[in-house]
Swiss-Prot record:
Name of the molecule in the record: Small ribosomal subunit protein bS18c
GO molecular function: small ribosomal subunit rRNA binding; structural constituent of ribosome
Chain's gene name: rps18
InterPro entries: Ribosomal_bS18, Ribosomal_bS18_sf
Comp. bias (Basic and acidic residues): 95-151, 159-169, 212-231
Region Disordered: start-end pairs: 1-31, 95-231
Subunit structure as annotated in this protein's UniProt entry: Part of the 30S ribosomal subunit.
Domain of life: Eukaryota
Pfam family, one: Ribosomal_S18
Record's compositionally biased regions (Basic residues): 9-26
Compartments where located: Plastid, Chloroplast
Gene3D superfamilies on file: Ribosomal protein S18
Organism classification: Eukaryota, Viridiplantae, Streptophyta, Embryophyta, Tracheophyta
Length: 231
């Protein structure tokens, strides 16, 4: 019988954690080292009235926090026992310098703000004045152009009126001259016709009178001749 082939299974390696030290070694505390007081209410819980660290049941989560607390308490206790000399003059001098520096900075800041504000106001005022001046000039220019246009319009109107008046006067003069010439021509024609008619009438009357006189004289002469012959 043949052996059944099974898939090769890798052997599981045992999971081993690296050994870690329970507490890290710290450098010895000296004067000037910084103490980290993160939570004062928690510190008060761990310290008794006599200044001793109280034993507490610690869980795995709060272990790290308690370690930091105990180290901070120990540091504070050691530092409080170290011989620090409190120099009041130096402290006061430092405080005075800090206060003067702060006041100087505030004064400089205030001065700077006032100067900037003043500059801004002057710039805005200048801009406003320039804008108003520009607007005024444009308005005056428009007004001048308007007046010029009205003047040219009025002059054009007056010239047109003058031209029309001249044309009217010329036309009226022409018509009056024509009328006068026509009337004079008519009157002269009438006078001529009247005079010619009068002269013709006079001539006709004279000729007729002459002819009648001649006829009468002839007839009278004939009658006288006949009378003389009868006698």
């Amino acid at each position: 019988m043949e052996k059944s082939e099974r898939p090769l299974i890798k052997k599981k390696r045992p999971f081993r954690k690296k050994k870690r030290s329970f507490r890290k070694r710290r450098s010895p505390i000296e004067s000037g080292h910084q103490i980290d007081f993160t939570n004062t209410s928690l510190l008060n819980q761990f310290i008794s009235q006599q200044g001793k660290i109280l034993p507490r049941k610690v869980t795995r989560l709060t272990l790290k926090q308690q370690r930091f607390m105990t180290s901070a308490i120990k540091q504070a206790r050691i530092l409080s026992l170290l011989p620090f000399v409190f120099d009041d003059k130096k402290v006061k001098k430092k405080q005075k310098e800090e206060f003067q520096k702060k006041q100087k900075e505030e004064f400089q800041k205030k001065q700077k703000e006032e100067f900037q504000k003043k500059q801004k106001e002057e710039f805005q005022k200048k801009q406003k004045e320039e804008f108003q001046k520009k607007q005024k000039e444009e308005f005056q220019k428009k007004q001048f152009q308007k007046k010029e246009f009205q003047r040219t319009k009025s002059t054009a109107r007056t010239t047109n009126e003058k031209q029309t008046n001249e044309k009217q006067t010329k036309s009226t003069a022409r018509t009056t001259n024509e009328k006068q010439t026509k009337s004079t021509a008519r009157t002269t024609n009438e006078k001529q016709t009247k005079s010619t008619a009068r002269t013709t009438n006079e001539k006709q009357t004279k000729s007729t009178a002459r002819t009648t006189n001649e006829k009468q004289t002839k007839s009278n002469d004939r009658t006288t001749d006949l009378r003389t012959r009868k006698k």
